[in-house]
Structures are given as C-alpha cells and as structure tokens.
C-alpha cells in the first residue's frame, strides 16, 4: 500500500522594500525643505528662552546641518555625472569653493567659515534634489513642503500668537522671522501648485479635473497668505516668474511649428531673452520712483538703499577678492570708515544677495555665479520643448534672482538657495545635450 502526498505551493507576498524606502525619502525631503524655510526652526528654538544667545545660534545651525547631511550622503552615493561637473554644475561648485577659500583672507574668518560651509552644504542638498527626482516629483515635494509652515502660520494668526501679526502695519508674519521670510514659502507654494496644474491640464491623466481643483484651492490659500504678508519683494518676483514662463511658452509654441532650430535657440532666442531680462532690470531701477508712485508709495526699500550704498562702497574697497563670505558686515572697520555707520552698525547682511556676493567674493565670486547661471540656461534650452513644464527651469531661476535683489537669499541653510541650485542643475529625467 503506497501513500500519496500532495504538496501545495504557497506564494508569500513580497515586501516591496524599495517602494517603502522611496516614500521614506519623499518624507525626508519634505521635512528638510520645511526646515530650510527657517520659520519652524526659529519658532521652536526661540521658544526655548535662549533668544539672542550664542547657544541659540549654534543650535539653529546644528539643526539645519543635521537635516541636510542625509542629502549630502545620498548625493555622494548616487554621484554626479561627468557631463554635469564639466558644465554649469561644476562652475556652481567652483563658486561655493571660492567662497569657502575666501575664509583665508576674510576680515572675520570665523563667521565666514561657518557661512561658507553652510552655503556649500545647501548647494549639495540642491544638487541631491536635482539628481534624485524628476521635475514632476520636485514640484510636488516643493509644494507639499511649503504647506505645514503656512498652515501653522495661518493658525497662529487666527489664534493671536505673539509676533504672528505686525499690528503697526497690519501685515502677517506667522511663525517666521518677518514678512519677507513668510512670503517666499507662500510664493513657492503658489508657483509649484500652478506648475503642477499646468502639467495636469496638458497631460490630462486620470482624475486630472479634481486634482486641478485641489491645486487651485492650494494656490488661492497660498496667494491669500502672500497678499496678507504685504511683501512686495515676493509679489514682484512672482510677476517676473509669470513673464519668463510666458516668454518660453511662446517660444515653445513657435518651436513646435519648426520655425526655430536648435542653433537659433542658442544663438538668437537665448541672447534675446537675456537682453530682455537685463532691460527689465534696468527699467526697474531707473524708474523706481515712478513705480512707487504707481503703487501709491506702498513699495519701498525700507532703508535698504543705505545698506546697498555701504555694500557697494565696500566692494570698491576690495573689488577682486572681496572681504570673505559674509565677513564685511561683521568687520568693525567696514562701518567706521563710512558716513552714517552708526545707523546700521547692528546689520549683518546687505539685504541683497547680489551685494552679498560682490562683497564676499569680489569680481571672481560674482563672475563664477553669473557664468553658472548663463551656462545653465544655455544647457537647459531643450527642456522648454521636451518637458511639459520645461519653462519652470528659467522661471524658477529668475524668480529666486529677482527676490535676491531685495533679500539675502543666496545663503546657506535657506530653501531659496536650494531652489536656485536645483533649477540650474536640472532633474533626473533630463536628457539635455552638451553645450
């Protein structure tokens, strides 16, 4: 008598570890970007009762560094292509290296070292975002990361938190340092939501209509918060973003009709774009008084003109090498040799990233940054045609640059510097020809 044994094969569901890790990485990037808006960090640590102390500054710096280190490690593991390093990304890293080297001749070397290291770290974090995520993913991450601080700020205003509203001029600050710290997250959230809505309308995937409605609601929320901040800096930067987006959208339509070749894009259209941007900048500064009167004098530089004059005079003192990154404003002689120095002796920056770059790195540092910006634009011309929202690269770059004329946004530990680096460096789905 024989015994028959039947074996039943049971398939155990596989645990998709890679998928889970990807979502963990998404969560990490959202948290990192939210931290680099600086509002949450300022609110948490300044509530510790150590406001104004050296311990508080060290704690805040350590917090920013801690949340960016995983990005640097992941970038090191994934690497950067030789094509990127031999192009504008290499020049951008050269700019950060120059500012780091400026510590050697800085007039306030200890401060310059900390500032230049943080500049480099945040640049690497921006490269990590560009290297690791597609344009669609980047836009989604930027959008989601901006919302927590904005929602908490809205809650803070509604519940009368201390410092959430400037009652003298009735503008909102929320959990941020000031209105020009509160407005950029609202502006980026608004722009990222708009770019995502653009992609949905163009692609029309499943559920595109309800998703577009949700994005529209987010845009209205962020725009409302931006308006309540009364920040003319971010509103003006958004205006330039829209102009740049419209310019490249028009070019995109003309190019699709085969009226413009790739060579013409590089040799004619791109120089024309740069000329228009320079012309608009010149008009803005030349006729600023008329613009102010048009806006009923609600736009003003809040005393920044004097800061810029000090910065320009300081640049002329050391035009080639500069004073060292963020070193000038921490040098006593920088004030005492100039008229009205006592009025701004407590200031530690120029209220203009353009002036900060000239002061910190001189002509060499400024030249490296300008070269990186121009070269990145030339390399990314193909995106205008190949990506559904390829206009984002140029529009986001000039959005940050426009805002940086009024605030020190080219600085370490700030999401605007990370955004600029990511926009200039591209995205994971790029297939950009070598220029």
Report the location of each language-model feature.
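Alpha-helical transmembrane segments of multi-pass inner-membrane proteins
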Residues: 68-72, 96-101, 137-167, 176-252, ...
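Hydrophobic transmembrane alpha-helices and their immediate junctions
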Residues: 131, 269, 360-401
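Transmembrane alpha-helices of multi-pass inner-membrane enzymes
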Residues: 191, 238-246, 393-435
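Long extracytoplasmic/lumenal interhelical loops at the membrane interface
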Residues: 293-309, 317, 321-361
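Transmembrane alpha-helical segments and their membrane-water interfaces
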Residues: 68-80, 97-154, 402
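Loop-to-helix entry and N-terminal half of a specific, functionally important transmembrane alpha helix
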Residues: 31-33, 213-220, 348, 352, ...
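N-terminal signal-anchor transmembrane segment
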Residues: 2-76, 97-105, 400-402
């Amino acid at each position: 008598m024989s015994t028959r044994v039947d074996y039943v094969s049971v398939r155990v569901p596989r645990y998709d570890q890679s998928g889970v890790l990807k979502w963990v990485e998404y969560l990490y990037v959202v948290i990192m970007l939210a931290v680099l808006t600086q509002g949450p960090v300022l609110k948490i640590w300044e509530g510790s009762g150590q406001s104004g102390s050296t311990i508080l500054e060290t704690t805040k710096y350590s917090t920013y560094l801690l949340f960016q280190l995983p990005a640097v490690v992941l970038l090191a593991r994934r690497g950067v292509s030789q094509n990127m390093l031999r192009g504008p990304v290499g020049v951008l890293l050269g700019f950060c290296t120059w500012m780091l080297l400026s510590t050697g001749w800085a007039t306030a070397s200890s401060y310059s070292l900390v500032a230049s290291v943080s500049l480099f770290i945040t640049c690497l974090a921006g490269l990590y975002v560009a290297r690791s995520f597609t344009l669609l993913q980047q836009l989604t991450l930027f959008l989601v990361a901006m919302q927590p601080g904005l929602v908490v700020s809205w809650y803070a205003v509604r519940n009368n938190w201390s410092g959430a509203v400037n009652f003298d001029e009735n503008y909102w600050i929320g959990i941020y340092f000031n209105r020009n710290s509160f407005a950029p997250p609202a502006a980026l959230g608004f722009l990222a939501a708009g770019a995502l809505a653009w992609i949905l309308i163009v692609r029309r995937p499943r559920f595109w209509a309800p998703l577009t409605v949700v994005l529209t609601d987010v845009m209205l929320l962020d725009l409302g918060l931006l308006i309540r901040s009364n920040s003319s800096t971010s509103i003006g930067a958004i205006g330039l973003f829209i102009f740049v987006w419209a310019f490249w959208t028009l070019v995109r339509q003309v190019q699709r009709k085969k009226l413009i070749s790739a060579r013409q894009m590089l040799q004619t259209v791109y120089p024309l774009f740069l000329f228009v941007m320079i012309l608009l900048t010149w008009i803005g500064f030349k006729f600023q008084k008329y613009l102010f009167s048009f806006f009923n004098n609600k736009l003003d530089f809040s005393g920044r003109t004097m800061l810029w004059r000090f910065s320009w005079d300081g640049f002329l003192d050391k035009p080639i090498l500069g004073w060292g990154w963020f070193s000038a404003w921490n040098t006593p002689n920088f004030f005492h040799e100039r008229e009205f120095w006592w009025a701004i002796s407590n200031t530690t920056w120029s209220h203009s990233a353009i002036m900060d770059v000239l002061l910190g790195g001189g002509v060499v540092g400024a030249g490296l940054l300008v070269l990186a910006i121009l070269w990145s634009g030339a390399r990314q011309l193909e995106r205008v045609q190949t990506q559904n929202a390829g206009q984002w690269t140029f529009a986001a770059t000039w959005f940050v640059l426009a805002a940086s004329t009024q605030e020190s946004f080219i600085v370490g530990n700030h999401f605007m510097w990370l955004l600029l680096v990511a926009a200039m460096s591209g995205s994971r789905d790029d297939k950009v020809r070598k220029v």
